[in-house]
Amino acid sequence: MAHNKFLPRVLAAAAAMMLLAGCSSKADPGFSPANPVNITIWTYYNGEQLEAFNALVDEFNSTVGKEQGITVESSSHGSVTDLENNVLASAEGKVGAEAMPNIFSAYADTAYALDEMGQIADLSDYLSEEDRTAFIEDYLSEGNFS
């Protein structure tokens, strides 16, 4: 039963990927297979969570992503602490750090620190009221820095 506590996180990440697909209907960003876009996602998922998430990424890439020219590349950065350290090193431009990913898993304290550095995008314009109902209200409130 331990893996059940991770299900909401995997579902939230899946919802985020589906929102990427939905964005084109609200404000046409011009996605096209002729002009492909690559989205990088960093997680701390391992084991079953990583397998489930990678299956969602593969499904997205072979369906909506393929149709719209969006490729998602996901990578696990080990533990939550490892991921936090890697994201912060990237945001701070430390020597040897990888380029900042487009999307990453983060707890509120890390997200807040990155927001203070100007590294967090406001997704409010991309979530309709209907979209918001798919999430647990506390998750949305915790991630609202305004």
Where are these regions (language model features)?
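Short, low-complexity disordered leader/linker segments with a strong preference
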Residues: 1-39, 62, 129
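Short loop/turn motifs at secondary-structure junctions
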Residues: 14, 99-100, 119
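Hinge/lid segment of periplasmic solute-binding proteins
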Residues: 106-146
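Secondary-structure boundary motif
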Residues: 25, 62-66, 89-96, 116, ...
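Alpha-helix N-cap/helix-start motif
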Residues: 30, 49-53, 116
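Early extracytoplasmic/lumenal segment of secretory-pathway proteins
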Residues: 36-40, 45-109
